[in-house]
């Protein structure tokens, strides 16, 4: 009897602890934002060995009256979240902070060809334009729609970029950072996915970073970067590799043997995805064509490395877009309605998966 009572007490305490952790979950994200604004990852990684709090403080830019106690509290949570490692000095008197694999992904700039950073994506997701829509989740459930449009007068996320250079840069840099990490994972694990393709159009390809990397790795491919006119207008030139085409994927898609879409369809409702997929089908030949979709395949009951992040990102899409993350069953339905009844899912070492779909 006593044992059962103790078990119930333990369960109740765990439940309470879980609620407290969720209540304060915003601290994780905002402390990460704080660390990037203070350039803490850059500072720690610029040293060859773990460094003291005072060394970090002395290197924070534009901070003549930095509060060392506050900085210590910020570092305490970052260590607890394993963003940084913590050590003792040789005399045991001081705490030292060192880099981790996580902090490497938060550097402001990459210097090596195989190096990636998600710092721009953190800056994007914590931008004030994206913060307010989260308070509208209950209204989203009651009324449908998404929080971003509710807060911003019916304008979608991408509607704010053309007339706002500051947000446009934050948006583009954020998308480019996720594109790079995903494209590198694909090229390292599934190079064969691009074999036998003579032409490839990257729909929603932003500035062309992904398609240029693919063509460099597979020189036989004619690469087309396709995005809205105001996006490709400022895209860099990839001489001999990629041509830029401006347009609207809901209206038409440039002709190619294969279509590549990375983190695009999850931004849209099912009926919108079907329209896009049908346009993709029209853009490719009757035989030999395929679509390569790079997106999350949800496993709600899964315990994989990225499953928790995937479910959380699905809620972000509810707040910010008209889209959602999809299970395999949901992907199958959308693909079939869009004209792609055959598909296979390839796992890659990333948050996303590769879905190869065929019109026959």
Swiss-Prot record:
<feature type="active site" description="Proton acceptor">
    <location>
        <position position="266"/>
    </location>
</feature>
<comment type="subunit">
    <text>Homodimer.</text>
</comment>
<dbReference type="GO" id="GO:0046983">
    <property type="term" value="F:protein dimerization activity"/>
</dbReference>
<dbReference type="Pfam" id="PF00891">
    <property type="entry name" value="Methyltransf_2"/>
</dbReference>
<dbReference type="GO" id="GO:0033802">
    <property type="term" value="F:isoliquiritigenin 2'-O-methyltransferase activity"/>
</dbReference>
<dbReference type="GO" id="GO:0032259">
    <property type="term" value="P:methylation"/>
</dbReference>
<keyword id="KW-0963">Cytoplasm</keyword>
<comment type="pathway">
    <text>Secondary metabolite biosynthesis.</text>
</comment>
<dbReference type="Pfam" id="PF08100">
    <property type="entry name" value="Dimerisation"/>
</dbReference>
<dbReference type="InterPro" id="IPR012967">
    <property type="entry name" value="Plant_O-MeTrfase_dimerisation"/>
</dbReference>
<dbReference type="InterPro" id="IPR029063">
    <property type="entry name" value="SAM-dependent_MTases_sf"/>
</dbReference>
<dbReference type="InterPro" id="IPR016461">
    <property type="entry name" value="COMT-like"/>
</dbReference>
<dbReference type="InterPro" id="IPR036390">
    <property type="entry name" value="WH_DNA-bd_sf"/>
</dbReference>
<dbReference type="GO" id="GO:0005737">
    <property type="term" value="C:cytoplasm"/>
</dbReference>
<dbReference type="InterPro" id="IPR036388">
    <property type="entry name" value="WH-like_DNA-bd_sf"/>
</dbReference>
<comment type="similarity">
    <text>Belongs to the class I-like SAM-binding methyltransferase superfamily. Cation-independent O-methyltransferase family.</text>
</comment>
<dbReference type="InterPro" id="IPR001077">
    <property type="entry name" value="O_MeTrfase_dom"/>
</dbReference>
<keyword id="KW-0808">Transferase</keyword>
<keyword id="KW-0489">Methyltransferase</keyword>
<comment type="function">
    <text>Involved in the biosynthesis of prenylated phenolics natural products which contribute to the bitter taste of beer and display broad biological activities. O-methyltransferase with a low substrate selectivity. Methylates chalconaringenin, desmethylxanthohumol, xanthohumol, isoliquiritigenin, butein, 2',4-dihydroxychalcone, resveratrol, genistein and guaiacol. Catalyzes the biosynthesis of 2',4'-dihydroxy-4,6'-dimethoxy-3'-prenylchalcone (4-O-methylxanthohumol).</text>
</comment>
<keyword id="KW-0949">S-adenosyl-L-methionine</keyword>
<feature type="binding site">
    <location>
        <position position="227"/>
    </location>
    <ligand>
        <name>S-adenosyl-L-methionine</name>
    </ligand>
</feature>
<protein>
    <recommendedName>
        <fullName>Xanthohumol 4-O-methyltransferase</fullName>
        <ecNumber>2.1.1.339</ecNumber>
        <ecNumber>2.1.1.338</ecNumber>
        <ecNumber>2.1.1.154</ecNumber>
    </recommendedName>
</protein>
């Amino acid at each position: 009897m006593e044992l059962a009572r103790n078990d119930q007490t333990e369960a109740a305490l765990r439940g309470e602890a879980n609620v407290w952790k969720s209540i304060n979950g915003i601290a994780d994200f905002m402390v990460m934002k704080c660390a990037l604004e203070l350039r803490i990852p850059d500072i720690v990684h610029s040293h060859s060995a773990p460094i003291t709090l005072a060394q970090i403080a002395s290197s924070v830019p534009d901070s003549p009256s930095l509060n060392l106690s506050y900085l210590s509290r910020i570092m305490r949570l970052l260590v607890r979240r394993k963003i940084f490692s913590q050590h003792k000095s040789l005399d045991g008197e001081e705490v030292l902070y060192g880099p981790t694999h996580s902090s490497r992904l938060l550097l402001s700039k990459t210097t090596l060809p195989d190096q990636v950073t998600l710092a721009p994506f953190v800056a994007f997701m914590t931008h004030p334009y994206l913060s307010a829509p989260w308070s509208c989740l209950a209204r989203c459930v009651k009324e449908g729609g998404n929080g971003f449009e509710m807060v911003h007068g019916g304008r979608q996320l991408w509607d704010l970029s053309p007339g706002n250079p500051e947000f446009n840069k934050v948006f583009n840099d954020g998308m480019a950072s996720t594109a790079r990490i995903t494209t590198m994972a694909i090229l390292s694990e599934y190079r064969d996915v691009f074999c036998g393709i003579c032409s490839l159009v990257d729909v929603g390809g932003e500035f062309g970073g992904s398609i240029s990397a693919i063509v460099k790795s597979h020189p036989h491919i004619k690469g087309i970067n396709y995005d809205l006119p105001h996006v490709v207008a400022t895209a860099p030139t990839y001489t001999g590799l990629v041509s830029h085409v401006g347009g609207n994927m809901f209206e038409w898609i440039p002709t190619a043997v294969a279509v590549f879409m990375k983190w695009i369809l999850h931004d849209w409702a099912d009926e919108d995805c079907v329209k896009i997929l049908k346009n993709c089908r029209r853009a490719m030949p009757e035989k030999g064509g395929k679509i390569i979709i790079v997106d999350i395949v949800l496993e709600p009951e899964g315990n994989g490395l990225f499953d928790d992040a995937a479910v959380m990102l699905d809620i972000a899409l509810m707040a910010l877009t008209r889209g959602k993350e999809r299970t395999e069953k949901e992907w199958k339905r959308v693909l079939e309605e869009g004209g792609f009844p055959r598909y296979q899912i390839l796992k890659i070492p990333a948050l996303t998966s590769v879905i190869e779909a065929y019109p026959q």
